[in-house]
Amino acid sequence: MVVPLKRIDKIRWEIPKFDKRMRVPGRVYADEVLLEKMKNDRTLEQATNVAMLPGIYKYSIVMPDGHQGYGFPIGGVAAFDVKEGVISPGGIGYDINCLAPGTRVLTEHGYWLKIEEMPEKFKLQRLRVYNIEEGHNDFSKVVFVAEREVGSEEKAIRIVTESGKVIEGSEDHPVLTPEGYVYLRNVKEGDYILVYPFEGVPYEEKKGVILDESAFEGEDPQVVKFLRERNLIPLQWKDPKVGILARILGFALANGYISENDNLTFHGKEEVLREVRKDLEELGIEAIVAEEDKLKVTSREFAFLLEKLGMAHDSIPEWIIEGPLWIKRNFLAGLFGANGSIVEFKGDVPLPITLTHSRELLNDVSRILEGFKVRAKIKMGKNGSYQLVIEDEDSIRNFLGRINYEYDPEKKARGLIAYAYLKFKELMKGNLMTFEEFARDRGYEGGFVAEKVIEVKSVKPEYDKFYDIGVYHSAHNFIANGIVVHNCGVRLIRTNLTEKEVRPRIKQLVDTLFKNVPSGVGSQGRIKLHWTQIDDVLVDGAKWAVDNGYGWERDLERLEEGGRMEGADPEAVSQRAKQRGAPQLGSLGSGNHFLEVQVVDKIFDPEVAKAYGLFEGQVVVMVHTGSRGLGHQVASDYLRIMERAIRKYRIPWPDRELVSVPFQSEEGQRYFSAMKAAANFAWANRQMITHWVRESFQEVFKQDPEGDLGMDIVYDVAHNIGKVEEHEVDGKRVKVIVHRKGATRAFPPGHEAVPRLYRDVGQPVLIPGSMGTASYILAGTEGAMKETFGSTCHGAGRVLSRKAATRQYRGDRIRQELLNRGIYVRAASMRVVAEEAPGAYKNVDNVVKVVSEAGIAKLVARMRPIGVAKG
């Protein structure tokens, strides 16, 4: 989607209501550098989709640190009417569930790739998906390939089906069953799951050029220009378009012709030509249905291209014969889709599959089929025509499982179910059902088949990473090993110490923090609560922590919402979420979560800084962590619930990730209660970490944190949260549910929600930078209330994925570079240091400058790091 932008001023941009589904415009806060980064992913498209949701007020907003998220952009803000609007987990914060490395993913061209190969080599490749609503397989481009660390105590689930298909992934990864999606952990032996029976072929890489401009010497220059504009020349072996061209050429040799005036026409059934047209459109070629059984290509240039690729000959072109197996497979599937016979059975025995054409071409086809272990004979018919015949059962099975048909939906679906049946025959002894019985009992539209699960195991992963793929298609699934698969915050603690006092002991201090505050992937807290004991934490948040000795009573005055959202309901949180959260309470986690010892090195507003208790040269500590696995599980649980409910409420669904329900619905209110519980867990978590930070300072400096070191909390802000607030819209006060995803509340002076000790100057806003760069403290403003529902940015925002960062940076080198700059880093692994390299993030100075110039937050102070502890 190309999203138009209208410049308002130097740092404000508007996404106009260019799509009739948009209820409001989009508003983007960014300079030109930051905006260009947003254009490189789906940030602006996601903001456009948010603008389509019911009950939205004013704008769909993107902060300068905005980047692509799940459903909503990270750095996105949207306010919905509490009566007419919606609530969406994707607008508050959500991650992904994943599959094991080595999992094979099926592409549109019929070859498999390992899921971990996708990010580097095949990000432009389209994948096969199951279009649930229309009941057939389809193709989709990839939105993202994501990865995450496997937790130290995390288990994976491995399931095996009766035909030997295996899938292994995180416990929360969904697979498709006849009744809908089910988490891997909930699959039981004897259950049925949906599989895509096609086996396909391995990928073979071939380098070089198939066709370049020299092939068109003497032709009209417009032909070359047309083809170059559509990236159809030069045509290289590695180009994903080659597979499409191979199957179109196969179809054209049987059911296409080029007229004397260079018009290209395909003929066939309407549903077949519809599929051909989709492939043509993917190449940028327009085609129109001239009659019920004819599809005409409007460009003579494409006809010239097919001629050069071999359509004018009565034999298979050399480039197909010389090509890798997957290219041959696409050519043959297009050819048999056009003119091959549909597979039929007599009881449990398959009848021969035939193809009628010239003897020369059939001889070529027979030779190519041998590479797929398919034996064929060529026979002469009564009328002098020639027929290729595949008649032995092994060859029929290999043809259906490795080649099959393209373009003809009926042939393809029946061929897939037939292949599954022939595999089923091998496994069954006696009492064998006929093919037609099997198709009725196990077959689904599109050629999908229900297979019984014969083994389910919980296993300890022998690998470090899980992977997942996001696709653009609304089906939001992909074929993996033949199976269809489918609140955070920041706290700032001040001290009375100066850099001069801390610098000599910075290594000892950071090492002590690292020792006392559990961190790392799957890290567990120092206290041991059973999952049945955390309901009080979910209700009382930071108050529970203080009541249990983790902090001081006055801490609660300095936390957003007092560290406790009213209305949290532990009953709305699943047992699984509690089981994930309980052992992690009081731990930092990994990735971009951190403890950072900082020095206030610049004061922009002395009056406000004084109110916040800050001075130049002062040492402060910043804590960034959230609700850990509990918060993720809450979002995951309710996404599934809402996906089932959304059709009931007839809510627009512009993006599969952007699931939502009416805020006042039963599902909406229950999710809001669960989200509050997750937020309370996060506040309790940061409160416990604060207690251990104070203990660490006491251990190193031998001084009392309260009486000597003055280690008060400056403030604690949430940046993945939904809140019911009152705001002014078009001169009227309205109640809204504000979604802040990777965005921070920024209330102005005088607002009743701002703590009394800061009410004269405005709410503190904490903006962490990336590792090794500055962080900022700002103050909320009236400008934020007027423009952004009292919201501003939350940090620097990534520009490189974690995988890309590890390819570009080495953790040990980054750590040494930071040490050379006077920043000591202690991390659970050097990989995390590489993932969090400063270059993996946007320039936080630019981000803060934009919000300051926009007047949606006011600069107060800048802090630079001198010590970092990371999980």
UniProtKB/Swiss-Prot annotation:
Required co-factors: Mn(2+)
Subunit structure: Monomer.
The encoding gene: rtcB
Pfam families: Intein_splicing (PF14890), LAGLIDADG_3 (PF14528), RtcB (PF01139)
Gene Ontology BP, a term: intron homing
Designated name of the protein: tRNA-splicing ligase RtcB
Mutagenesis or variant effect for residue 592 to A: Abolishes tRNA ligation activity in vitro
Example GO molecular function: GMP binding
Role played: Essential for tRNA splicing and maturation. Acts by directly joining spliced tRNA halves to mature-sized tRNAs. Joins RNA with 2',3'-cyclic-phosphate or 3'-phosphate ends to RNA with 5'-hydroxy ends.
